[in-house]
């Protein structure tokens, strides 16, 4: 064939433009995203991506898995080490699948689960609209305290004692402040229930020692994503110290929720775990500093930043109320036009019906922190956001500023820089940029 098909040209063009736009030209403030290091990226594209390895390491239903067994076992060991856990399972291909496996083990259809309130950021997988509902488990929300922007502990204890659920979930997707694990765990266990902690957003902060470790405070099992504050490939994981629970969950993930578990994730996950072992504390601490700095700068620039009376945030996230600027949908779109990527989000006082045009915009600093930005850069970002949303400046002009600003921050930090990849490969596979 002398001429390549138009469709192929289009596929390559779209991929190149995506890489160029999101990787080189934008300020990405989506809290659920991050970037891998070049080292982790280099092992993501491998022969593992074509292979199957159903079951557990060294107990497979397929032949040809000796290296898959080794890499999965090593990745599990590294994740257990940084999580301070006895066990780790990396076969869940997302945080939602990790939740599904745990929920299925702990409750049957018709049973009750008490969840962190939606206002406190509960993820959709915790609700009747998501995984919980798909499994037929009844959702009961804990009371929410507007002042503390958190679970109302006293009322939650009373509810747990009355309902006697099979399990209780903490953790969320709009997650500014830690949920009360230590305060609730004894009462959860007193009624024979298990405490499930969804650390999808804060797992990198946990292993970086910038957030409390829920396993050390009484959680029975922790689920996570591997691509938010933990800057690995997209995927999920489960960690626990409970022997019996681990066996049940491990026997449920396969074959209930995954068959092949996307082996090509495992080398990248293992490298990211190593990066977090050696650089995670510095990275996580800078994330928290940057989030606080961004929140303070946004408030100084005239934005209504949620949680000011509590110090704005203790995580990687910042939330702003933009009702006076046209609402979350409008403002998030304006930001995107200026190459500032964020997402509209319900705020604690929004009704669920406002999901398509909520009061807020949710921000996260973990990716820009990985590219080396610090507190001063957060103040620059806040100023650029003011120009877009408050001063109504020409978004094209602001976009030029954003793109120019971003040129100074293209190198991933908090990684190993002394590895010669040429020693391990005769072909370097690079992004289409």
UniProtKB/Swiss-Prot annotation:
Q: Does the keyword Transmembrane helix apply?
A: no
PROSITE patterns recorded: SHMT (PS00096)
**CC annotations in GO:** cytoplasm
**Cofactor(s) for this UniProt protein:** pyridoxal 5'-phosphate
Where is this protein found?
Answer: Cytoplasm
What coarse category fits the chief subcellular location reported for this protein? cytoplasm
A family per Pfam: SHMT
Q: In which pathway does this enzyme or protein participate?
A: Amino-acid biosynthesis; glycine biosynthesis; glycine from L-serine: step 1/1
A GO molecular function held by the record: pyridoxal phosphate binding
GO biological process, alphabetically ordered: glycine biosynthetic process from serine; tetrahydrofolate interconversion
Quote the record's binding site residues for (6S)-5,6,7,8-tetrahydrofolate.
122-124
Taxonomy, superkingdom: Archaea
Q: Which InterPro entries match?
A: PyrdxlP-dep_Trfase, PyrdxlP-dep_Trfase_major, PyrdxlP-dep_Trfase_small, Ser_HO-MeTrfase, Ser_HO-MeTrfase-like, Ser_HO-MeTrfase_PLP_BS, SHMT-like_dom
Q: What is its EC number?
A: 2.1.2.-
Q: Which UniProt keywords apply?
A: Amino-acid biosynthesis, Cytoplasm, One-carbon metabolism, Pyridoxal phosphate, Transferase
Q: What positions are modified (N6-(pyridoxal phosphate)lysine)?
A: 228
Residues at site: Plays an important role in substrate specificity?
227
Q: What does this protein do?
A: Catalyzes the reversible interconversion of serine and glycine with a modified folate serving as the one-carbon carrier. Also exhibits a pteridine-independent aldolase activity toward beta-hydroxyamino acids, producing glycine and aldehydes, via a retro-aldol mechanism.
Q: Which PANTHER family match?
A: SERINE HYDROXYMETHYLTRANSFERASE, SERINE HYDROXYMETHYLTRANSFERASE 1
Q: How does it associate, per the subunit comment?
A: Homodimer.
| Assigned protein family | Belongs to the SHMT family.
Q: Mind telling me what this protein is named?
A: Serine hydroxymethyltransferase
> What organism, scientifically named, is this protein from?
Sulfolobus acidocaldarius (strain ATCC 33909 / DSM 639 / JCM 8929 / NBRC 15157 / NCIMB 11770)
The coding gene here is glyA
């Amino acid at each position: 064939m002398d001429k390549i098909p138009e469709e192929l040209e289009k596929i390559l063009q779209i991929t190149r433009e995506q890489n160029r736009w999101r990787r080189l030209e934008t300020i990405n403030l989506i809290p659920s995203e991050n970037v891998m290091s070049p080292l982790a990226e280099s092992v993501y594209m491998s022969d593992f991506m074509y292979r199957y390895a159903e079951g557990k390491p060294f107990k497979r239903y397929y032949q040809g898995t000796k290296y898959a067994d080794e890499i999965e076992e090593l990745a599990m060991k590294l994740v257990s080490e940084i999580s301070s856990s006895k066990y780790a399972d990396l076969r869940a291909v997302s945080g939602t699948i990790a939740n599904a496996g745990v929920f299925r083990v702990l409750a049957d259809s018709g049973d009750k689960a008490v969840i962190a309130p939606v206002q406190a950021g509960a993820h959709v997988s915790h609700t009747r609209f998501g995984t919980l509902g798909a499994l037929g488990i009844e959702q009961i929300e804990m009371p929410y305290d507007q002042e503390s922007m958190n679970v109302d502990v006293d009322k939650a204890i009373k509810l747990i004692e009355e309902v006697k659920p099979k399990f209780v979930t903490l953790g969320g997707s709009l997650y500014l402040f830690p949920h009360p694990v230590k305060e609730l765990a004894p009462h959860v266990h007193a009624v024979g229930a298990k405490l499930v902690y969804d650390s999808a957003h804060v797992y990198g902060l946990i292993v970086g020692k910038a957030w409390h470790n829920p396993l050390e405070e009484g959680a029975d099992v922790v689920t996570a994503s591997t691509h938010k504050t933990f800057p690995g490939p997209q995927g999920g994981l489960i960690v626990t110290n409970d022997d019996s629970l681990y066996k049940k969950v491990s026997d449920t993930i396969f074959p209930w929720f995954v068959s092949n578990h996307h082996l090509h994730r495992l080398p990248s996950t293992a490298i990211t775990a190593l990066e977090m072992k050696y650089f995670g504390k510095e990275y996580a601490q800078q994330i928290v500093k940057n989030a606080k700095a961004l929140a303070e700068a946004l408030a100084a620039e005239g934005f209504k930043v949620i949680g000011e009376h509590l110090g704005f945030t203790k995580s990687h996230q910042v939330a702003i109320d933009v009702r006076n600027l046209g609402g979350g949908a409008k403002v998030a779109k304006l930001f995107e036009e200026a190459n500032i990527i964020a997402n509209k989000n319900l705020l604690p006082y929004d009704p669920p019906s406002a999901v398509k045009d909520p009061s807020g915009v949710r921000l996260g600093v973990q990716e820009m922190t990985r590219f080396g930005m610090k507190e001063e850069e957060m103040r620059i970002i806040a100023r650029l956001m003011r120009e877009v949303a408050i001063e109504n400046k020409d978004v094209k002009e602001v976009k030029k500023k954003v793109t120019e600003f971003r040129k100074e921050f293209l190198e991933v930090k908090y990684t190993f820089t002394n590895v010669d990849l040429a020693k391990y490969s005769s072909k370097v596979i690079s992004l289409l940029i």
